[in-house]
Amino acid sequence: MTYTRNHDPNFFEECQSFANCGSFAFNVEEWYSPDEYFEDDMGQTIEQWIDRCVWNGWDVYDMSNEFAGILVNYILNDFDDVRYLIWEGEIQPDEELIAFRTFVDTEGDWDFHFKVFRDGLWLEKCGSDPVRFCEENDWNNGLIEYIIQTIYFARKLES
């Protein structure tokens, strides 16, 4: 899928319901879900994949990590101007830092979340809620705690 890049600095204030954390992080106008076309290496849906993981005795942490690894590949395929970082210190002056975590539980629920480091501040957009300030290391939204280690991306800023 091709995503429409946003060029309006007020877009995320005016069009809150059309954008989520992924839209905000990657600066696209569409609701961005890296799991939208999920298919693992065995051709399974997310639900089938979770069932297989639970059947094999995986815990929440292992499932969340594996899920993140699968989604990282989707993200890198979706955006040519995004790269995976080994650590956040690799960020270049012409890039924006994006933090990412996932959550999967044994009941079949899953989620992902992105945060953006912009103008010296961490920002996030939770679903259709407005963009807000956040802490880099606070990954508990009251319903879900994203327990895995943070994955970082760099997105090339538009000139």
Feature locations, PLM:
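Active-site-adjacent structural segments surrounding the nucleophilic cysteine of cysteine proteases
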Residues: M1-C15
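Active-site or metal-binding loop neighborhoods of secreted/extracellular toxin and effector enzymes
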Residues: L121-S159
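...with weaker cross-activation on analogous glycine-rich loops/strands in unrelated enzymes
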Residues: Q44-D129
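Active-site nucleophilic cysteine motif
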Residues: E13-Y32, E39, G43-T45, S64-A68, ...
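Short amphipathic alpha-helical surface micro-motifs
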Residues: T4-R5, D80-V82, V131-E135
